[in-house]
């Protein structure tokens, strides 16, 4: 069936009230209409995710042990592997991803027509060896698609096995190094985040960008992304400074002092005072009195600085800017999606800063439904489990010969999920439509809304 532009049918719901997911401009969606949920899902028998500090080990569940998901019709079900850590240090997050996936499959069960997904959850134990065993197990059971693993090392370990069997992988990592050749990553890459916030800074007239990054693989990726984004936006790169990611704030402080040319600006102030003192006119005396209130003389050579930290770390580093006499009302701090946290908004040095984000409403609806079912607040990005399972369920309803082909998975019009619109590219990366928010005083607000179609990004 031909594509029908601007047709945005719902294909999943959070209960009867929330219509959040849509398959954008795709033949499959144009051929189907959602059914209404007539029954509430049974209360899940899965315990709420334990605290990350001490996750409780749990056995790998099987498809038969997941009461939230209605049993698929064996005659028309499509096996899909779900590979996440359900034991080990990351068990809590792995369980949250699985919980979210169960929600998606229950919601999608309301849609009539086509095959249904038979989810095959397996415990990767958070190790490459565990991931290999889990992948081999589900593929031996006929899995036609693998959702997960979580960690890039695990994805790298299973990729050759999946390719050998022609089974595509949709992983939860954000490491682009493992993407491609049948492996797709759903995670939020620093590259897409930096590009969005730097583009917005350019649209607001900022011209000179700096970056303060940890000296780590992640920091190097951010630094490279800043260079590319600055060049693409036609801006000027001021400086990129790095620090030991394990260093205390006291050891990061000298890096910020040098980056802001603090000593040079103090020397400029002393020189200016000496020049004015040598003069004996009233104007010079007035100017000298004004300089007495200053700590430095002259501005820093950047209008914005990218700081890819979060939590307590960003709250410790950001105050170093005003400490070294940088006016944060004029110099914008630019962050990552991890700044979308009320605790981060309590830092005065970040007020006025910008960061990328996903649309609030779908995430809030997902979180409310998750809390109702599991009695706990989902951790950030647990919704990727929902998006992945919903993607699999929708594609499973297409013709068996084309349901999980590269062409189906990489539909250019994309999909809309809990975290906004996204599409998977032939290179295996996820492109997303992100909003930009501004940090307020213990609050944040959207200053550039997320697009609702990819046409808005390309036009």
Predicted regions and their residues:
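Extracytosolic ligand-binding ectodomains
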Residues: 2-24, 28-459
């Amino acid at each position: 069936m031909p594509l029908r532009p601007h047709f945005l049918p719902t294909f999943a719901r959070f209960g009867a009230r929330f219509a959040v997911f849509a398959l954008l401009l795709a033949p499959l969606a144009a051929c189907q209409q959602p059914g209404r949920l007539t029954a509430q899902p049974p209360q899940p028998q899965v315990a709420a995710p334990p605290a990350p500090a001490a996750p409780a080990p749990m056995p790998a569940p099987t498809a038969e042990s997941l009461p939230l998901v209605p049993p698929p019709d064996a005659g028309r079900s499509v096996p899909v592997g779900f590979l996440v850590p359900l034991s080990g240090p990351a068990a809590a997050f792995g369980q949250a991803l699985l919980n979210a996936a169960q929600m998606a499959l229950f919601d999608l069960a309301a849609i009539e027509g086509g095959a249904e997904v038979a989810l095959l959850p397996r415990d990767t134990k958070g190790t490459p060896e565990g991931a290999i065993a889990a992948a081999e197990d589900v593929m031996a059971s006929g899995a036609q698609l693998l959702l997960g693993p979580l960690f890039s090392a695990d994805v790298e370990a299973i990729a050759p096995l999946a390719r050998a069997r022609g089974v595509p992988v949709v992983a939860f990592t954000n490491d682009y190094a493992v993407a491609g050749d049948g492996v797709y990553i759903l995670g939020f890459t620093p590259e897409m985040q930096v590009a969005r916030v730097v583009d917005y800074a350019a649209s607001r007239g900022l011209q000179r960008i700096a970056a303060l990054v940890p000296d780590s693989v992640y920091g190097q990726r951010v630094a490279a992304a800043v260079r590319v984004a600055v060049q693409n936006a036609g801006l000027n790169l001021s400086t990129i400074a790095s620090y030991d990611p394990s260093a205390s704030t006291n050891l990061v402080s000298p890096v910020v002092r040098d980056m802001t040319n603090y000593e040079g600006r103090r020397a400029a102030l002393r020189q200016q005072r000496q020049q004015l003192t040598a003069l004996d006119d009233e104007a010079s005396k007035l100017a000298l009195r004004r300089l007495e209130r200053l700590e430095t003389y002259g501005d820093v050579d950047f209008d914005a600085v990218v700081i890819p930290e979060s939590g307590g770390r960003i709250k410790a580093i950001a105050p170093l800017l005003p400490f070294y006499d940088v006016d944060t009302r004029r110099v914008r701090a630019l962050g990552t999606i991890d700044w979308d946290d009320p605790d981060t908004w309590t830092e005065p040095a970040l007020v006025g800063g910008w960061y990328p984000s996903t649309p609030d409403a779908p995430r809030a609806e997902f979180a409310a439904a998750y809390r109702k079912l599991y009695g706990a607040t989902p951790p950030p990005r647990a919704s990727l489990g929902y998006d992945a399972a919903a993607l699999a369920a929708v594609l499973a309803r297409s013709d068996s010969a084309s349901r999980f082909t590269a062409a189906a998975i990489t539909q250019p019009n994309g999909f809309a999920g809990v975290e906004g619109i996204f599409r998977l590219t032939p290179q295996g990366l996820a492109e997303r439509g992100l909003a930009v928010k501004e940090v307020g005083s213990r609050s944040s607000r959207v200053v550039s809304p997320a697009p609702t179609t990819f046409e808005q990004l390309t036009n």
